[in-house]
Amino acid sequence: MPISLGSKGSCQIGGNIATNAGGLNVIKFGSIRNNILGIEAILPNGEFYDDLKTVKKNNTGFDIKQLLIGSEGTLGIITAATFQIHKKTNDRVVIFLHSTHLMYC
């Protein structure tokens, strides 16, 4: 999962989605909103909302999934989610800097 959270030992996926958590890799992979493909939730009126489809893009009507992400539980309780998985990279960048005076660094 591309989202790397500082509180990974104590947080839950549903709470991360409800608050649109960013995490430590937010610049590289985007927030959790950019990595969710589908959501299943219970709406406040008791209706069951299911958007766990395999279609990546759907432009028909309102995107309730995007409304639920970041709503902090006010628009519904998220019960399941489908995430986009990124390939793990092992890239490292190392920079060595040498100077005779600290003020030139």
At which residue positions do the language-model features occur?
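FAD-binding subdomain of flavoenzyme oxidoreductases
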Residues: M1-C105
